[in-house]
From Swiss-Prot:
Protein's name in the database: Small ribosomal subunit protein uS13
Keywords, alphabetical: Ribonucleoprotein, Ribosomal protein, RNA-binding, rRNA-binding, tRNA-binding
Domain of life of the native organism: Bacteria
NCBIfam families tied to this protein: uS13_bact
Species: Methylobacterium nodulans (strain LMG 21967 / CNCM I-2342 / ORS 2060)
Gene: rpsM
Length: 122
């Protein structure tokens, strides 16, 4: 198993698919990385040489924010919005949808399990 950006990526999958196991790398970035390094898309991880794995590792470290750094950056962005007291920050603070979705019905994922209200029977 190759270890890239602190993640064990599966050895029997294609490189483009295996790179997507890293938080912050999706299909487009995975293809971009393999093109930069010069690895064919159909090559499997267990067929990579140590030099190629090192090239992939260096390309990711140099050009992308992934894993813990990305999670930390997103958390800091949300905290900044909350500290500013802007509308988006208030919505985050109250655990409500941030991007304009309706909340009268729906929004159960963000709000949590429905709380029963006593005396609401007909």
């Amino acid at each position: 198993m190759a270890r890239i950006a602190g993640v064990n990526i599966p050895t029997n999958k294609r490189v483009v698919i295996a790179l997507q196991y890293i938080h912050g790398i999706g299909p487009k970035k995975a293809e971009e990385i393999t093109e930069k390094v010069g690895i064919p898309a159909e090559r499997r991880v267990n067929q990579l040489t140590d030099a190629e794995v090192l090239q992939i590792r260096e390309a990711i470290d140099r050009d992308y924010i992934v894993e813990g750094d990305l999670r930390r950056e997103v958390a800091m962005n949300i905290k900044r919005l909350m500290d500013l007291g802007c509308y988006r920050g208030l919505r985050h603070r109250r655990n409500l949808p941030v991007r304009g979705q309706r909340t009268h019905t729906n929004a159960r994922t963000r709000k949590g399990k429905a709380k029963p209200i006593a005396g609401k029977k007909k």
